[in-house]
């Protein structure tokens, strides 16, 4: 049977099977959702609608709402620590390294309201989800090692 000019045709979908892109998009939208509404107020169905994916796919990728929340925290801390690592603090004199670290931290927090909101929300939870993440513990451990190194070198 041929389509006539009046027969509706299905539009080609712009969706592609790109799990990494989909997960990155989910994390981006979920970051805003959790930052602005907290864990309790965020809704998976709103995240799904904003990312043109299904709740089922979100649960497939992240396991649960809490799993998505932990992934958001891991991504947020990971971005910060990655930039921090590029400061090459070990190559600088201790006082200058500390100055650069403090300035970076201030500038990062000043320019990343969602990060501050996530930290505040997690503080309300008494660090419950930060404590569950081995990745965040490792990331924050490296930050503590950096400060310890600066102290040992003479700050």
Task: Identify the residue ranges that each predicted region occupies.
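Solvent-exposed, non-membrane alpha-helical residues enriched in polar/charged side chains
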Residues: 23-24, 31, 59, 70, ...
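Residues in soluble alpha-helical coiled-coils and helical-bundle/repeat scaffolds
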Residues: 63-67, 71, 78, 89-92, ...
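Short secondary-structure transition hinges
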Residues: 100, 106-149
């Amino acid at each position: 049977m041929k389509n006539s000019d009046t027969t509706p045709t299905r539009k080609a979908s712009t969706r592609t099977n790109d799990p990494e892109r989909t997960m990155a998009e989910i994390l981006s939208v979920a970051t805003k959702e959790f930052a602005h509404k907290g864990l309790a107020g965020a809704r998976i169905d709103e995240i799904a609608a904003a990312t043109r994916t299904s709740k089922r796919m979100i649960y497939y990728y992240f396991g649960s709402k809490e799993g998505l929340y932990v992934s958001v925290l891991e991504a947020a801390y990971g971005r910060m620590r990655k930039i921090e690592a590029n400061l090459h603090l070990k190559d600088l004199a201790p006082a200058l390294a500390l100055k650069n670290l403090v300035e970076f931290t201030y500038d990062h927090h000043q320019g990343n309201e969602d990060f501050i909101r996530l930290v505040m929300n997690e503080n309300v939870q008494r660090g419950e989800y930060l404590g569950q993440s081995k990745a965040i513990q490792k990331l924050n451990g490296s930050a503590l090692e950096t400060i310890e190194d600066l102290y040992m070198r003479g700050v």
